[in-house]
């Protein structure tokens, strides 16, 4: 099963417990990107409850890797059967409004030699739930952490 590690410069210096405590004390509600990231992190641990809550019953997406339309159950299988060890950065919001979210994140894939990729995901919402999404993946010939404000080693 694939592994997901989250890189977040916003939360650097805080333990997971401190982050949750801050949210509880401040009454902070997770925003769209936090909810999306948390949902898929939980899927990798076998917990599908949050994904089931945030996806619309009519959800459908075209998976560019397989060339088929998928529903949320298909997406769960695809994510949980990933054989590679993958570390994923915390998503950065490109654009967001009530009905749309566009994010970019980076991955380090642990092959014999590490390789890197970026992915941009565009998400449409209906009634506050994810109706569809499209993700495009770009293989990179450089380590994105060398050019951004974080590094993989802090989170591996």
Task: Show where each model-derived region lies.
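Short histidine/acidic/glycine/proline-rich micro-motifs that form metal-
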Residues: 42, 65-66, 108-110
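A beta-strand edge to alpha-helix "cap/lid" segment located at domain peripheries
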Residues: 38, 76-156
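A solvent-exposed, acidic/Ser-Thr-rich amphipathic alpha-helical stretch
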Residues: 34, 48-99
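Short, low-complexity N-terminal intrinsically disordered segments enriched in polar/charged residues
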Residues: 11-53, 57, 150-156
């Amino acid at each position: 099963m694939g592994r997901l590690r989250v890189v977040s410069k916003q939360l650097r210096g805080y333990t997971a417990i401190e982050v949750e405590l801050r949210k509880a004390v401040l009454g902070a509600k997770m925003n769209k990107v936090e909810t999306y990231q948390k949902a898929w992190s939980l899927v990798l641990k076998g917990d599908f409850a949050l994904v089931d809550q945030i996806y619309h019953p009519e959800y459908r997406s075209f998976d560019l890797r397989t060339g088929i339309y998928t529903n949320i159950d298909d997406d769960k299988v695809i994510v949980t059967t990933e054989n590679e060890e993958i570390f994923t950065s915390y998503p950065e919001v490109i654009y967001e409004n009530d009905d749309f979210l566009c994010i970019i994140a980076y991955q380090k894939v642990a092959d014999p030699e590490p390789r890197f990729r970026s992915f941009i995901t565009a998400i449409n919402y209906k009634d506050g739930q994810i109706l569809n999404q499209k993700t495009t993946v770009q293989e990179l010939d450089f380590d994105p952490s060398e050019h951004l404000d974080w590094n993989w080693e802090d989170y591996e």
